[in-house]
From Swiss-Prot:
Organism whose genome encodes this protein: Haemophilus influenzae (strain ATCC 51907 / DSM 11121 / KW20 / Rd)
Keyword Transit peptide: no
Gene expressing this chain: moaD
Keyword Iron-sulfur recorded: no
Sequence similarity: Belongs to the MoaD family.
A single MF term (Gene Ontology): nucleotide binding
Protein name: Molybdopterin synthase sulfur carrier subunit
GO BP terms in the entry: Mo-molybdopterin cofactor biosynthetic process
Function: Involved in sulfur transfer in the conversion of molybdopterin precursor Z to molybdopterin.
Subunit structure: Heterotetramer of 2 MoaD subunits and 2 MoaE subunits. Forms a stable heterotetrameric complex of 2 MoaD and 2 MoeB during adenylation of MoaD by MoeB. During catalysis MoaD shuttles between the two heterotetrameric complexes.
Matches recorded under InterPro entries: Beta-grasp_dom_sf (IPR012675), MOCS2A (IPR044672), Mopterin_synth/thiamin_S_b (IPR016155), ThiS/MoaD-like (IPR003749)
One GO CC annotation: molybdopterin adenylyltransferase complex
Length: 81
C-alpha cells in the first residue's frame, strides 16, 4: 500500500489531504498519472511540470521508483517573495 499526501494548492484543488493506494506502481510518475485520471480537478492539481514530489520525506524526481509502504507527497513548487 502507498500512502499519498497532498499539500497546499494541490490539496485545495482536489479537496483531499491523503489517500491510500493498493495498486502496484513502478514510479511516482505512474502514481501521478493514475490519480490525474480521477477527474478534471485531479488532472489540474497534478499537472506535470507544476508539481514536486517527496518520497519518504525526501524531494525526488517524478521518475523515481516507489515501493509498497512508501509515503508519497505531491505539492506545488514553493515560491517566495
Amino acid at each position: 500500500m502507498l500512502n499519498v499526501l497532498f499539500f497546499a494548492q494541490t490539496r485545495e484543488l482536489i479537496g483531499v489531504d491523503a489517500i491510500q493506494l493498493e495498486d502496484d506502481f513502478a514510479t511516482a510518475e505512474a502514481v501521478r498519472e493514475h490519480l490525474a485520471q480521477k477527474g478534471d480537478k485531479w488532472a489540474l492539481a497534478l499537472e506535470k511540470g507544476k508539481l514536486l514530489v517527496a518520497i519518504n520525506q525526501t524531494l525526488m524526481p517524478l521518475e523515481s521508483a516507489v515501493k509498497n509502504g512508501d509515503e508519497i507527497a505531491f505539492f506545488p513548487p514553493v515560491t517566495g517573495g
